[in-house]
Amino acid sequence: MQIAVTGATGFLGHYIAQNLASDGHQLRCWHRPSSNRQPLDALSHQVTWLPGDLSDASSAATLVDGCDAVVHGALWRTGSTFRKNTSDLIEFTETNLLGTLRLIEAARKAGVKRFIFISTCAVHEEILDDRPLDETHPLWPRTHYGGP
């Protein structure tokens, strides 16, 4: 399969990209100028890197063109780590939410049949002891990153 991956240079994303490539898939991955692509250098014969980010609708269309699936794990943020995000909440939400919607729409227009959106454990800053940690567990994020 040809799979578009956003966030491939991130913590989870590079593991996902490695696993998809080891299963024989061809990948089209977004990168920003500041991205560290070195952990995926060994996969260069299976990975096509394309410049792009969540704020650019045309790069979303280019990324998903010809793909069978999308794995979306990208995040726009400022600050040194995702948990110490210093960006304005409005800018953070607009860029990530609208960027994700642009990516979904680009995938729909391109006829992509599968779209996987990766969340984060940061939605569960507080975990209740009396129930399992599953999709019914209440969400209590403390940062923009874990927020809705």
Language model regions located:
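Conserved Rossmann-fold NAD(P)-dependent oxidoreductase catalytic core, especially the SDR/UDP-sugar
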Residues: 72, 98-144
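Conserved glycine-rich Rossmann-like NAD(P)H-binding loop of the short-chain dehydrogenase/reductase
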Residues: 25-35
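Glycine-rich NAD(P)-binding loop of the Rossmann-fold in SDR/ketoreductase-type enzymes
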Residues: 55, 91-102, 143, 147-148
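Conserved hydrophobic beta-strands of the Rossmann-like cofactor-binding core
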Residues: 3-5, 70, 115
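Residues at the starts of beta-strands that form the adenosine-phosphate
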Residues: 2, 26-27, 113-114
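N-terminal Rossmann NAD(P)H-binding glycine-rich loop of SDR-like oxidoreductase domains
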Residues: 3-23
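NAD(P)H-binding glycine-rich loop region in Rossmannoid oxidoreductase-like domains
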Residues: 45, 51-95, 106
